[in-house]
């Protein structure tokens, strides 16, 4: 699979990116190199190769030793919000930064 400059321009347009011609060529080169590597890996014959062991498969039926989900500290939201300039229903109010 190989991309063209038109493919890069289309994807950039969909992503609302403005690429200079040299950026387009650089991106095209990088992506085509990536696709060439993927094609090389796909061409490798893996018949008879055992999959690597997965830790969960090695453990099998043994129960995982996880700690109980218990709150270790009390809720201090009110104390944290005392110095906040604006709070509403337990949430910090901040100025709008995106139009």
UniProtKB/Swiss-Prot annotation:
Please state the Enzyme Commission number of this protein.
6.3.5.-
- Tell me, what is one Gene Ontology molecular-function annotation carried by this entry? ATP binding
GO terms classed as biological process: glutaminyl-tRNAGln biosynthesis via transamidation; regulation of translational fidelity; translation
Is this entry keyworded Transmembrane helix?
A: no
Keywords of the record, alphabetical order, are: ATP-binding, Ligase, Nucleotide-binding, Protein biosynthesis
Catalysed conversion reaction: L-glutamyl-tRNA(Gln) + L-glutamine + ATP + H2O = L-glutaminyl-tRNA(Gln) + L-glutamate + ADP + phosphate + H(+); L-aspartyl-tRNA(Asn) + L-glutamine + ATP + H2O = L-asparaginyl-tRNA(Asn) + L-glutamate + ADP + phosphate + 2 H(+)
Oligomeric state and interaction partners are given as: Heterotrimer of A, B and C subunits.
Belongs to which family? Belongs to the GatC family.
Instruction: Relate the protein's function as given in its record.
Output: Allows the formation of correctly charged Asn-tRNA(Asn) or Gln-tRNA(Gln) through the transamidation of misacylated Asp-tRNA(Asn) or Glu-tRNA(Gln) in organisms which lack either or both of asparaginyl-tRNA or glutaminyl-tRNA synthetases. The reaction takes place in the presence of glutamine and ATP through an activated phospho-Asp-tRNA(Asn) or phospho-Glu-tRNA(Gln).
Q: Which HAMAP family match?
A: GatC (MF_00122)
- The name under which this protein is listed is Aspartyl/glutamyl-tRNA(Asn/Gln) amidotransferase subunit C
Gene responsible for this protein: gatC
